[in-house]
Regions:
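Extreme N-terminal starter segment of soluble prokaryotic enzymes
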Residues: 1-5
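Active-site beta-loop-alpha junctions enriched in small/polar residues
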Residues: 6-10, 33-37, 74-77, 113-115
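Residue-level preference for long, well-ordered alpha-helices that form the structural scaffold
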Residues: 11, 47, 51, 85-89
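Glycine-enriched alpha-helix->loop->beta-strand junction motifs that scaffold or abut catalytic
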Residues: 25-29, 104
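Glycine-rich, positively charged N-terminal anion/phosphate-binding segment
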Residues: 33, 42-61
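Short glycine/proline- and charge-enriched loop/turn segments
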Residues: 38-41, 122-124
């Protein structure tokens, strides 16, 4: 078993600084947010897919701090009643899956949070 943290908890910090903090705290793996309600502070999958060097930079940072990727995640509501909002969530999810494939990550997490949208300040 490995201790993992959802990196969006440190979204205000640059990814390198967040990884350093987590490694010093004994964390061994990270779940990286890639869109949806928590945002894309450390990883915008569309941007990473368009610029593969960003993938290399992220993987190098993780290696530097001896961290693994537990999962990529995008917590959005792909069945949102507003079609434009739903489409953005779908795009984030699709790009996250494609990015996971490129990065060799075998776990992608998606959760709509439809029951508790107030936790992420979204207006349904």
């Amino acid at each position: 078993m490995k201790l993992s943290v959802f990196a969006v908890l440190l979204a205000a910090k640059p990814f390198d600084e967040a990884c350093k903090y987590l490694a010093n705290a004994g964390v061994q793996a990270v779940e990286i947010g890639c869109g949806g309600f928590p945002g894309k502070a450390h990883c915008d999958p569309k941007e990473f897919l368009a610029h593969p060097e960003k993938i290399d930079e992220m993987l190098a940072t993780l290696k530097k701090y001896n961290l693994e990727i537990a999962a990529l995640s995008t917590h959005g509501n792909c069945v949102h009643p507003n079609p434009e909002v739903a489409r953005q969530f779908e795009e984030d999810y699709e790009n996250t899956i494609l990015l996971a494939e490129k990065m060799g990550v075998d776990t992608v997490v998606n959760s709509a949070f439809a029951i508790t949208p107030h936790l992420f300040h979204c207006g349904f």
